[in-house]
Swiss-Prot record:
Alphabetical GO biological process terms: alkaloid biosynthetic process; cinnamic acid biosynthetic process; L-phenylalanine catabolic process; L-phenylalanine metabolic process; paclitaxel biosynthetic process; protein homotetramerization
Main location as per UniProt: cytoplasm
Cross-link 5-imidazolinone (Ala-Gly) mapped to chain: 175-177
Binding-site positions, (E)-cinnamate: 231, 319, 325, 355, 427, 455, 458
Protein name: Phenylalanine aminomutase (L-beta-phenylalanine forming)
Cellular localisation: Cytoplasm
Residue numbers annotated as active site: 80
Organism of this sequence: Taxus canadensis
A single cellular component GO annotation: cytoplasm
Catalyses which reaction(s): L-phenylalanine = L-beta-phenylalanine; L-phenylalanine = (E)-cinnamate + NH4(+)
Superkingdom as given in the UniProt entry: Eukaryota
Purpose: Phenylalanine aminomutase that catalyzes the rearrangement of L-phenylalanine to R-beta-phenylalanine. Catalyzes the first committed step in the biosynthesis of the side chain of the alkaloid taxol (paclitaxel), a widely-used compound with antitumor activity. Also has low phenylalanine ammonia-lyase activity.
Gene giving rise to this polypeptide: pam
Modified residues (2,3-didehydroalanine (Ser)): 176
Length: 698
C-alpha cells in the first residue's frame, strides 16, 4: 500500500494561527500581503494591534482607479452606481454624482436597534465592526473599487484610534454585499448625526463628534464611493474570520482532550495505531490519529489501565465504545470541513468583493457579482454542522464518565463522597450537557436554504452569509460551554483516578500487614490481596467494611475459598485458620476505614498538592495533559468537587469557560503539544513514532 501520510498539517496550521494571533503587532494592508483569520481575530480582540496602510505598494493603483471613475463620471459614461440608479432601479440615470452616493447611504441606514425587546443583543459586536472596516480597507487596495486614497487613510485612522460605528444586528442578506451594516461605516465617514460611534469600549458619541475627536472631517462622497463602501461581503467575512479562528482552536482543543478522555476512562490506545488509518487514508483521520497516538505515547495512565485489566480481563468489553475508539474517523470530516472553510474565508478576506469592478487599464467597468457571499454563507453552514459534530463527541464522552458501568471504576456522577446518598457530584453538569448538545444540534440546521428574493426581485438569490456566520458564532459559544464542562469533569476524573490508586495501595498495605500479623498462610494472603486490587475502590469507599459492599464480600468469599482448600488437604486443621481469619476481619474493620478516610480527606483538601511523598498521587505529572490539569487546578484555582466543599460546579465551570472564551486556554494547549511537530521517526524508551510504524506497515 503506497498511501502517503499528510503529516500534522492541520495541527501545524492551527498552532500557526494561534502564534500569529498572540504575536502580531501590525497588520500590513497593501493588497499583496495575505491577511489570515488570525490577523482579523487579533485586530478584533486586541486593541494594541495596529493597521498599516502601505502607500508604496498600492496607492498608485488606487488613485489611478479613482481618477478613472471621476473622469468617466464627468464625461457622462453609463456606469452602474456612478451615473445610474441602484439595484432594480438601475434603469434610472443622473448627473448628480455626489448626491447619488449620499442618497444611497441615507436609504441603507435602515437598521433598527431592538433595545427593550426579549433579546438583550441588538447590535453587532464592535469586534465584528472593526474587522469589517479592516476587510473593506483591504478590498480597496486592489485598485478596482474607485475610492479615494484619503477615504482609505480615514478608515486606517479610525481603526488605529479604536473608533467604530454601532451597527444593528439584523438586516443583511449578504448580496448585494452587507449593504445595511456597511452603510453605518459609510455613515460614520460622512458624519451622519444619526450614526453613533464607539470610542474605545465605553464612550459613545454621534459620528461628527467621533470624527472631530480623531482629527477628521466628514467626507463628501464622490462618484461610486458610497457604492464601494457598502457593496461588499466585509461584515459576513469579518465575522466568519473570527468564527474560523475560534473553530480551529476549539477543534484542536477537542482533539487533544480526546486523549485526556482516553487516559481517565482507562481506554485502550490501540485505536490510534497507524495501520488502522493507513488502510483508510482520509487526511483528517490520519492527522487526528497521529496526534492522539503521540499524546498517549508512554502515558502513565495507560500503564495503570493495562495493570487494571491484567487483573481481570472481563472487567470491560474487548473494544472501547465508539466515542473513543472511532474518534479519529469521527473527527476526519470535521477537520477537513474546518480546514476547507478556513481557506475559503481567507480567500474572501483577500479579495475585491464589490461591483462593478473597474478595469482602468482596459478602460472599462465590469458589471459582475463579487458581492455575492455564498462561499462564506455555505461554509458557515458546513462549519456549524462540524461544530455540532464536535459537541456530540464531547457529549458521548462526558456521558461515559458519568455512568459507573461505563467508566471503568470511577464513581457515578464522579462523586467523591464519602456518603453517596447526599453527594451527587457532577449530575447537574450531566443535565446541562444534554441541554447544550440539543441546542447545538438544532443550530446545525442550515441558514442558506432559507433564501428569499429581495430588493424588488433584483437580489433574487442571496447568500445570507452574515446570518449564517452569526449562528455559527452562537454555536461556538455553546461548544465552549461543553468543552468547559467536559474539561472540568476530566480534571475531577484525574483526581479520582489518583485517589483511587492511593486508596488501593492503602487497602493492599492494610490487608498485607494484617495477614502477616494474623499469621495467615501465603496462599490465603495472595487471595486476599487479589481481592484488594481487583474490587473497584469506589464501590465500597462509602463504608469499606460494610458486609454488604463488594470489598468485604470479596474478602469473605476469598477466606471461604482458603478454608475449603485447606479442608481438602489431609492432616491440616482448619479451626486455626478460621480463628485467624476472624481475627483478621476484626482488625480490618478497626483499621481500614480510618486509614482510607485519612487519605481521602487529605486529597479532598489539597488535591494533587499531596503528591510530595506518594507515587500514586503524581500519576498526572507524567502525562502530556499535565498543562491542562495544572491550568485548571492552579491557574484557575478550582478544586476537587465533593459534598464537603461549598464550591458549586457552576463556579468552577465558569472559570474554565471564561478562560476558553478569552483565549487563555491556548496557553496549556500550546504547552501540551510542545514537541509534537518536531518529533523524529524514532522515540526514546524503544517506542516508535506514528510515522515510523506507518513506514514499516507497507
Amino acid at each position: 500500500m503506497g498511501f502517503a501520510v499528510e503529516s500534522r498539517s492541520h495541527v501545524k496550521d492551527i498552532l500557526g494561527l494561534i502564534n500569529t494571533f498572540n504575536e502580531v503587532k501590525k497588520i500590513t494592508v497593501d493588497g499583496t500581503t495575505p491577511i489570515t483569520v488570525a490577523h482579523v481575530a487579533a485586530l478584533a480582540r486586541r486593541h494594541d494591534v495596529k493597521v498599516a496602510l502601505e502607500a508604496e505598494q498600492c496607492r498608485a493603483r488606487v488613485e489611478t482607479c479613482s481618477s478613472w471613475v471621476q473622469r468617466k463620471a464627468e464625461d457622462g459614461a453609463d456606469i452602474y452606481g456612478v451615473t445610474t440608479g441602484f439595484g432594480a432601479c438601475s434603469s434610472r440615470r443622473t448627473n448628480q454624482l455626489s448626491e447619488l452616493q449620499e442618497s444611497l447611504i441615507r436609504c441603507l441606514l435602515a437598521g433598527v436597534f431592538t433595545k427593550g425587546c426579549a433579546s438583550s443583543v441588538d447590535e453587532l459586536p464592535a469586534t465584528a465592526t472593526r474587522s469589517a472596516m479592516l476587510l473593506r480597507l483591504n478590498s480597496f487596495t486592489y485598485g478596482c473599487s474607485g475610492i479615494r486614497w484619503e477615504v482609505m487613510e480615514a478608515l486606517e485612522k479610525l481603526l488605529n484610534s479604536n473608533v467604530s460605528p454601532k451597527v444593528p444586528l439584523r438586516g443583511s442578506v449578504s448580496a448585494s454585499g452587507d449593504l445595511i451594516p456597511l452603510a453605518y461605516i459609510a455613515g460614520l465617514l460622512i458624519g451622519k448625526p444619526s450614526v453613533v460611534a464607539r470610542i474605545g469600549d465605553d464612550v459613545e458619541v454621534p459620528a461628527p463628534e467621533a470624527l472631530s475627536r480623531v482629527g477628521l472631517r466628514p467626507f463628501k462622497l464622490q462618484a461610486k464611493e458610497g457604492l464601494a463602501l457598502v457593496n461588499g461581503t466585509s461584515f459576513a467575512t469579518a465575522l466568519a474570520s473570527t468564527v474560523m479562528y475560534d473553530a480551529n482552536v476549539l477543534l484542536l482543543l477537542v482533539e487533544t482532550l480526546c486523549g485526556m478522555f482516553c487516559e481517565v476512562i482507562f481506554g485502550r490506545e490501540e485505536f490510534a495505531h497507524p495501520l488502522i488509518h493507513k488502510v483508510k487514508p482520509h487526511p483528517g483521520q490520519i492527522e487526528s490519529a497521529e496526534l492522539l497516538e503521540w499524546l498517549l505515547r508512554s502515558s502513565p495512565f495507560q500503564d495503570l489501565s493495562r495493570e487494571y485489566y491484567s487483573i481481570d480481563k472481563l472487567k470491560k468489553p474487548k473494544q472501547d465504545r465508539y466515542a473513543l475508539r472511532s474518534s479519529p474517523q469521527w473527527l476526519a470530516p470535521l477537520v477537513q470541513t474546518i480546514r476547507d472553510a478556513t481557506t475559503t474565508v481567507e480567500t474572501e478576506v483577500n479579495s475585491a468583493n464589490d461591483n462593478p469592478i473597474i478595469d482602468h487599464a482596459n478602460d472599462r467597468a465590469l458589471h459582475g457579482a463579487n458581492f455575492q457571499g455564498s462561499a462564506v454563507g455555505f461554509y458557515m453552514d458546513y462549519v456549524r454542522i462540524a461544530v455540532a459534530g464536535l459537541g456530540k463527541l464531547l457529549f458521548a464522552q462526558f456521558t461515559e464518565l458519568m455512568i459507573e458501568y461505563y467508566s471503568n471504576g470511577l464513581p457515578g456522577n464522579l462523586s467523591l463522597g464519602p456518603d453517596l446518598s447526599v453527594d451527587y457530584g457532577l449530575k447537574g453538569l450531566d443535565i446541562a450537557m444534554a441541554a447544550y448538545s440539543s441546542e447545538l444540534q438544532y443550530l446545525a440546521n442550515p441558514v442558506t436554504t432559507h433564501v428569499h428574493s429581495a430588493e424588488q426581485h433584483n437580489q433574487d438569490i442571496n447568500s445570507l452569509a452574515l446570518i449564517s456566520a452569526r449562528k455559527t458564532e452562537e454555536a461556538l459559544d455553546i461548544l465552549k460551554l461543553m468543552i468547559a464542562s467536559h474539561l472540568t469533569a476530566m480534571c475531577q476524573a484525574v483526581d479520582l483516578r489518583q485517589l483511587e490508586e492511593a486508596l488501593v495501595k492503602v487497602v493492599e498495605n492494610v490487608v498485607s500487614t494484617l495477614a502477616d500479623e494474623c499469621g495467615l498462610p501465603n496462599d490465603t494472603k495472595a487471595r486476599l490481596l487479589y481481592v484488594a486490587k481487583a474490587v473497584p475502590v469506589y464501590t465500597y469507599l462509602e463504608s469499606p467494611c460494610d458486609p454488604t459492599l463488594p470489598l468485604l464480600l470479596g474478602l469473605e468469599q476469598s477466606c471461604f475459598g482458603s478454608i475449603l482448600a485447606l479442608h481438602k488437604k489431609d492432616g491440616i486443621e482448619t479451626d486455626t485458620l478460621v480463628d485467624r481469619l476472624a481475627e483478621f476481619e476484626k482488625r480490618l474493620s478497626d483499621r481500614l476505614e480510618n486509614e482510607m478516610t485519612a487519605v481521602r480527606v487529605l486529597y479532598e483538601k489539597k488535591g494533587h498538592k499531596t503528591a510530595d511523598n506518594n507515587d500514586a498521587l503524581v500519576r498526572i505529572q507524567g502525562s502530556r495533559f499535565l498543562p491542562f490539569y495544572r491550568f485548571v487546578r492552579e491557574e484557575l484555582d478550582t478544586g476537587v468537587m465533593s459534598a464537603r466543599r461549598e464550591q458549586t460546579p457552576q463556579e468552577d465551570v465558569q472559570k474554565v469557560f471564561d478562560a476558553i472564551a478569552d483565549g487563555r486556554i491556548t496557553v496549556p494547549l500550546l504547552h501540551c503539544l510542545q514537541g509534537f511537530l518536531g518529533q523524529p521517526n524514532g522515540c526514546a524508551n524503544g517506542v516508535e513514532s506514528f510515522q515510523s510504524v506507518w513506514n514499516k506497515s507497507a
